[in-house]
């Protein structure tokens, strides 16, 4: 049995080391791009030796997946309190929280939008689409079974990616509140167009 060190159990120490690696990797991906992730680079940023990397991750791909999970968890913490619980139109409060999180946090925007769109994290793009679908879906529905919901989510995330990243690069001269309003309105319009469209076959 492994004895606690300074009152901290071995399991807690392992969890802490893993969290440090994930946070360090998230910050690197969010500032330099996911292509800058490497075992040595991440361990140096986390203040750990390489052997502790392999204690938590079998490969760099596993770490990349954990970075996306970390980013989605950070997003969920912002938006889940605004998830609608009853029927109605598009959830405006959820939309504003979702868009606002990406406008306020450039690292989060880069990881979830830029790096999953043609970047090193592109294999995880579908997870971002799933978040958008779930947030816009009426309570009790099965959005994953609705092809039009997925098509609409791709259009919404594509629009959000271009405008949000352009704003972070200083290419859009508008206030933060205006950008959030514009993006939320575009989400609603795309959702309305999807809902009004004729039935779409999944074949």
What are these regions, as identified by a protein language model?
Residues 8, 14-41:
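Short, amphipathic alpha-helix enriched in basic
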Residues 28-62, 66:
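Helix-turn-helix
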Residues 1-5, 134, 138, 166-203:
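C-terminal peripheral helix-coil segments that are non-catalytic and often amphipathic
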Residues 118-162, 177-181, 185-188:
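Amphipathic alpha-helical packing segments from all-alpha helical-bundle domains
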Residues 77-106:
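Hydrophobic alpha-helical connector segments
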Residues 99-123, 137, 165:
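Amphipathic alpha-helical segments used for helix-helix packing
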Residues 39, 67-76:
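Short, basic, alpha-helical segments at the C-terminal edge of helix-turn-helix-like DNA-binding modules
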Residues 17, 21-29, 71, 75, ...:
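Short hydrophobic clusters on alpha-helical segments that form packing/core surfaces
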């Amino acid at each position: 049995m492994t004895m606690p060190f300074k009152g901290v159990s071995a399991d807690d120490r392992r969890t802490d080391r893993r969290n440090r690696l994930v946070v360090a990797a998230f910050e690197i991906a969010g500032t330099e791009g996911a292509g800058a992730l490497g075992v040595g680079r991440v361990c140096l940023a986390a203040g750990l030796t390489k052997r502790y990397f392999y204690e938590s991750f079998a490969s760099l791909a596993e770490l990349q997946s954990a970075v996306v999970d970390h980013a989605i968890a950070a997003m969920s913490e912002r938006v889940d309190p605004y998830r609608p619980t009853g029927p109605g139109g598009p959830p405006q409060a959820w939309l504003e929280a979702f868009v606002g999180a990406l406008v306020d946090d450039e690292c989060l925007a880069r990881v979830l939008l830029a790096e999953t769109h043609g970047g090193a994290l592109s294999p995880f793009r579908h997870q971002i689409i799933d978040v958008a679908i779930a947030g816009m879906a009426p309570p009790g529905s099965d959005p994953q079974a609705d092809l039009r919901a997925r098509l609409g989510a791709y259009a919404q995330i594509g629009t959000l990616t271009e405008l949000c990243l352009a704003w972070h690069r200083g290419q859009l001269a508008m206030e933060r509140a205006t950008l959030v309003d514009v993006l939320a309105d575009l989400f609603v319009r795309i959702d309305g167009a999807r809902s009004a469209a004729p039935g779409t076959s999944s074949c």
